[in-house]
């Protein structure tokens, strides 16, 4: 069974993915995959080198420099994003195939823009994760995401209401870690996945 996580930025999707690990889930962490691709994928590195001056350091993509180009969100960035999404999708398909061989009960996709990139089509269920505005603001502050970047990210995402409507379950991460874990356990139990 494959579960995808969705929600706004700074709501705790990666934390929820880690909670699922406690119940034996394998997690596909797209951010980790992208970090690896920025180090080794020759097509992605070459494209960045040609289109984003200064974004390559020691043969790898420098995420800090690259993030400045994100704010332009021009055709070069959209093409770059398409290359990255395609490479991540290839890695996801390998991950799913390998996991089928060992017959694991649960895979969790921690993929930013899960719905927008259509990665949700791999999922049996989708969980909408949310937090109250105070908790979300605190997390965004900890990640040094300023208003300009937040506004751009929000503009390329589906509206939160639509994400919620497309989801099968919801988890509120505004509460204690224990309560969040109990919400994850309730979902695992409802899907008869507990061991």
From Swiss-Prot:
SUPFAM superfamilies in the record: P-loop containing nucleoside triphosphate hydrolases
EC nos: 2.7.1.24
Any one cellular-component term (Gene Ontology): cytoplasm
DPCK domain location: 2-195
Top-level taxon of origin: Bacteria
Transmembrane segments: none
Biological pathway: Cofactor biosynthesis; coenzyme A biosynthesis; CoA from (R)-pantothenate: step 5/5
Subcellular location: Cytoplasm
Catalytic activity: 3'-dephospho-CoA + ATP = ADP + CoA + H(+)
Alphabetical UniProt keywords: ATP-binding, Coenzyme A biosynthesis, Cytoplasm, Kinase, Nucleotide-binding, Transferase
Matching PANTHER family: BIFUNCTIONAL COENZYME A SYNTHASE-RELATED (PTHR10695:SF46), DEPHOSPHO-COA KINASE-RELATED (PTHR10695)
HAMAP family: Dephospho_CoA_kinase
Family: Belongs to the CoaE family.
Protein name: Dephospho-CoA kinase
Annotated organism of origin: Wolbachia sp. subsp. Brugia malayi (strain TRS)
Encoding gene (name): coaE
